[in-house]
Amino acid sequence: MEQGTVKWFNAEKGFGFIERENGDDVFVHFSAIQGDGFKSLDEGQAVTFDVEEGQRGPQAANVQKA
């Protein structure tokens, strides 16, 4: 798993971006967030995640709040 920081996340649209430790950004969809209840992330929040190849390039999977 990688570690990163939430760059931004739009809860209304259900997606955002995580900044990886290497400085690259990776797309995150709310469906990739682990846990119960409303799935959202806060700007600046530390997270761990896997990276999978999506239809439009790399995207975060198995996102967990650190």
UniProtKB/Swiss-Prot annotation:
Induction: In response to low temperature. CDD domains: CSP_CDS. It is found in: Cytoplasm. PROSITE patterns: CSD_1 (PS00352), CSD_2 (PS51857). InterPro entries: Cold_shock_CspA (IPR012156), Cold_shock_domain (IPR050181), CSD (IPR011129), CSD_CS (IPR019844), CSP_DNA-bd (IPR002059), NA-bd_OB-fold (IPR012340). GO terms for biological process: mRNA stabilization; regulation of gene expression. Residues 4-63 form the CSD domain. It holds the Pfam family CSD. One of its GO terms (cellular component) is cytoplasm. GO terms for molecular function: DNA binding; nucleic acid binding. Homodimer. PANTHER family: COLD SHOCK DOMAIN CONTAINING PROTEINS. This is Cold shock-like protein CspLA. It comes from Listeria monocytogenes serovar 1/2a (strain ATCC BAA-679 / EGD-e).
